[in-house]
Amino acid sequence: MDVDEIESAGQINISELGESFLQTFCKKAATSFFEEFGLISHQLNSYNFFIEHGLQNVFESFGDILVEPSFDVIKKKDGDWRYATVFKKIVIKHDKFKTGQDEYVEKEILDVKKQDILIGSIPVMVKSVLCKTSEKGKENCKKGNCAFDQGGYFVIKGAEKVFIAQEQMCTKRLWISNSPWTVSFRSETKRNRFIVRLSENEKAEDYKIMEKVLTVYFLSTEIPVWLLFFALGVSSDKEAMDLIAFDGDDASITNSLIASIHEADAVCEAFRCGNNALTYVEHQIKSTKFPPAESVDDCLRLYLFPCLQGLKKKARFLGYMVKCLLSAYAGKRKCENRDSFRNKRIELAGELLEREIRVHLAHARRKMTRAMQKQLSGDGDLKPIEHYLDASVITNGLNRAFSTGAWSHPFRKMERVSGVVANLGRANPLQTLIDLRRTRQQVLYTGKVGDARHPHPSHWGRVCFLSTPDGENCGLVKNMSLLGLVSTQGLESVVEMLFTCGMEELMNDTSTPLCGKHKVLLNGDWVGLCADSESFVGELKSRRRQSELPLEMEIKRDKDDNEVRIFTDAGRLLRPLLVVENLHKLKQDKPTQYPFKHLLDQGILELIGIEEEEDCTTAWGIKQLLKEPKNYTHCELDLSFLLGVSCAIVPFANHDHGKRVLYQSQKHCQQAIGFSSTNPNIRCDTLSQQLFYPQKPLFKTLASECLEKEVLFNGQNAIVAVNVHLGYNQEDSIVMNKASLERGMFRSEQIRSYKAEVDTKDSEKRKKMDELVQFGKTYSKIGKVDSLEDDGFPFIGANMSTGDIVIGRCTESGADHSIKLKHTERGIVQKVVLSSNDEGKNFAAVSLRQVRSPCLGDKFSSMHGQKGVLGYLEEQQNFPFTIQGIVPDIVINPHAFPSRQTPGQLLEAALSKGIACPIQKKEGSSAAYTKLTRHATPFSTPGVTEITEQLHRAGFSRWGNERVYNGRSGEMMRSLIFMGPTFYQRLVHMSENKVKFRNTGPVHPLTRQPVADRKRFGGIRFGEMERDCLIAHGASANLHERLFTLSDSSQMHICRKCKTYANVIERTPSSGRKIRGPYCRVCASSDHVVRVYVPYGAKLLCQELFSMGITLNFDTKLC
């Protein structure tokens, strides 16, 4: 059977499987993917790999620590001599000649002692291999752990911290840039970096015919590229040209190569003879500011392309770099795009911890070496190693990095990077997942970001193109898509496997040409050659689909550059795709379950990288695949999986404006109050919200079904009517049914914890002069202690309000250190926790519970970005009601839909209405009930006709309209009202937390204006728009009172004659008696001085201008 027959058989098998079967298979395959990897496996896998392998690699990279007593590490020179002996040179004659080789006396290790010592403490990631809660199942929940908790975060000093995945530049490939024209061999180690640059020859005699020359930057020095070729063993110019092997007739390229040869002749005339080129390279390297201690041969062996062994291989790789640069300059090769994910790697907890520990371990080593050096410089003997090694260096360094969020820069040792660690959000389980799947690109906001904020084609299927914050982080902070998977570091060596697939070895010889063979690059290293790249790549992919090669291996065949690039490193974004040519295997065996590992082993699914996907032809779905199966090599599981976890659960998201979906996915879903954990009674969060009666929506999405997580929805199903109601639901306001709220709708509780700690008597860190602070009840002048017991803590159920002492602390002398409830804080004591921390201090936490029912000013939102505040609470008897007696819970304004372009909410209400109502029997059908349409998955939603027919079968209007009666008059309303169930969310923005009221209060000492903090009795933020509103309403007296009298009222003196500012001074008039008052120094009189009332901010501005030498003239009028 030939290839055409095989393809036709595969096409027939795919068509015979049917659309329904394939869609069901895609759903089960996605479910098995989430069961295998979950949503946060990238965080756990990275940390586990660091613990099992990366940590040991860090210590092995430092090698042995050598401490010599004659070396002063502070002065970086030999130390002082204690016992000096003067030697003089004498001549010794011997009658024997030296024959044979030199012999050396090696140092012999007399004693080897091994012992376990504490180097430092490393935080343990929750649910990792080191965590005691890593076990799964009901037993874990019985121990008090949360059933929603998937781990992936750290607990640092009682706060939950999470790593934000960092997008860093890939160092596993050559980097070609056009500004300036360079090709770089990047490495995290500075000495291993190598750059070839094509620049103008500044030493040319005729600047009009100045040609570009090739130079290299190696070990902080600049060397002509032709000299480096000969230093690596190239014997002739022709051999160097053959290594470059530029296949083109561009005159500018030829001139650049000739100019490069001339430049090499200019700096070293006889570089082709002997070792002159190597000598010149040695001279340049040793002339740098910080020359290496190794010889030039060792420098070329250790620092120049350390992945290649042999100078001839290094010369060949240098010729390859030059060819890449010249091809890009001639327009035959594209420059690298820094915004493409093919040129990026995702750094997670393992890589970030490894880099940070390396910095602190180097610090601890230097500190230990200095202490041992000081001990050896004296007469004393060395003490045990733990006496010199300070374990707090690593422990405190990591704690400081977690607390401040500033971590080591990946390429610059002296700089720190912020935004690496953030507090884990706990408003609801969805917010927690979003924080764990977030990525961040580090750029300078002050400079030109370029296209970094814009979506890139490489984001497709790996990064959600809607989930990004607004503001300065827009486009820089992203969220991984549902099926996005971060690759882990491969442990097994694949080089030997590549030889079995047809790869030829790269010989250490520059005289043999490649003869049209293609280069094979493994993680950026040139490992071999292949004669037929097409068959070689086909064999690699076939073996990968049979699990003979790593499943996360990425294989790219570049026909234009004659390269085969293979990647097995960590940090690449992968995603699963259906392999079309292997779908016929599903017909042979149709199990009820599809383990994801089994699908990968069978080659039905494979993990595709970004570069490999460039050669794939992917169908957008099963429907598109079945139309033309021959045209596609791969197929998507579902288009909704291209979105992030917060976007994929939005119903009818493809019908809404993108901005509204962004608001829901990035703001509202993270601010929605839900049920954040199953163990709230044992947690001591600073602030948490819990919804009393959370519900799941009536509709379903494919993502929520595959994830099997109903807790991703945080809200309740409300009957929503689209109508105007007494004008109270204009401008983002909604009207709610008061009776529904009294029945418990959207009722929640807020739990706030207050924490305090005290030192124990045996605490080492407490200063000796400080008094010991202990918990206890004492008479307090700052607040009331009526609810406190003798131990200083309130009793359970105590009703506490503003001014009460919540935790009593005092010293032996009676000094009060208690914690008082601030302004607007109140609640009922729910629990009191007393424990101790790792630092030996006792700490206490008191949690206050407060029930919050919706009130005016609270914020609500649907899942379509339709946000609004509660503007009016209407009695149920005054609400409009339908013929069946249904009274809506919420009434929103119809003008909210055209401007915000959210027809998806109307479709959701119509679909939910058809789901909630009973389905009538279909005439002429044997089935008792027709099949319900429940799915509202983005990009595969049911059509409008299907939704309207479902409503019609249920006995309702096709378009969801209802005939209603006026609740106030009982008359039937003329117009029909659209009504249906809609999933609404209550957000954390509540008026009780934001309302401000004050007459006068604390002011800023400089501007004398009210402070901003609400808990400090601060004022409200009053801007130009608020001022314009009061002016439009004619409330000038209120405006004058609020902005002047109760804010920063002040006065200043003006001279009406010269119109300048008059100071209040103390002077002695002709009468001889000292007086103090306003006086105009310009007019030398106080006769025309008047007093005016101005805000102190205006007066301060005038005084600052006066100090700058700017004089102001004031016109005054009598009022």
UniProtKB/Swiss-Prot annotation:
Signal peptide: none annotated. Gene3D superfamilies: 2.40.50.150, 3.90.1100.10, DNA-directed RNA polymerase, subunit 2, domain 6, RNA polymerase alpha subunit dimerisation domain, RNA polymerase Rpb2, domain 2. It is found in: Nucleus. One of its GO terms (molecular function) is ribonucleoside binding. Coiled coil: none annotated. The keyword Metal-binding applies. Its main location: nucleus. Its EC number is 2.7.7.6. Zn(2+) binds at C1055, C1058, C1080, C1083. The keyword Magnesium applies. GO terms for biological process: DNA-templated transcription. It comes from the Eukaryota. Keywords: DNA-directed RNA polymerase, Magnesium, Metal-binding, Nucleotidyltransferase, Nucleus, Transcription, Transcription regulation, Transferase, Zinc, Zinc-finger. Mg(2+) binds at D732. GO terms for cellular component: mitochondrion; nucleus; plastid; RNA polymerase IV complex; RNA polymerase V complex. A zinc finger (C4-type) spans 1055-1083. It catalyses: RNA(n) + a ribonucleoside 5'-triphosphate = RNA(n+1) + diphosphate. InterPro entries: DNA-dir_RNA_pol_su2, DNA-dir_RNAP_su2_dom, DNA-dir_RNAP_su2_hyb_sf, RNA_pol_bsu_CS, RNA_pol_bsu_protrusion, RNA_pol_Rpb2_2, RNA_pol_Rpb2_2_sf, RNA_pol_Rpb2_3. DNA-dependent RNA polymerase catalyzes the transcription of DNA into RNA using the four ribonucleoside triphosphates as substrates. Second largest component of RNA polymerase IVa and IVb which mediate short-interfering RNAs (siRNA) accumulation and subsequent RNA-directed DNA methylation-dependent (RdDM) silencing of endogenous repeated sequences, including transposable largest subunit. Also required for full erasure of methylation elements. Required for intercellular RNA interference (RNAi) leading to systemic post-transcriptional gene silencing. Belongs to the RNA polymerase beta chain family. Component of the RNA polymerase IVa and IVb (Pol IV) complexes. PANTHER family: DNA-DIRECTED RNA POLYMERASE I SUBUNIT 2. This is DNA-directed RNA polymerase D subunit 2b. The lineage of its organism: Eukaryota, Viridiplantae, Streptophyta, Embryophyta, Tracheophyta. The gene is NRPD2b.
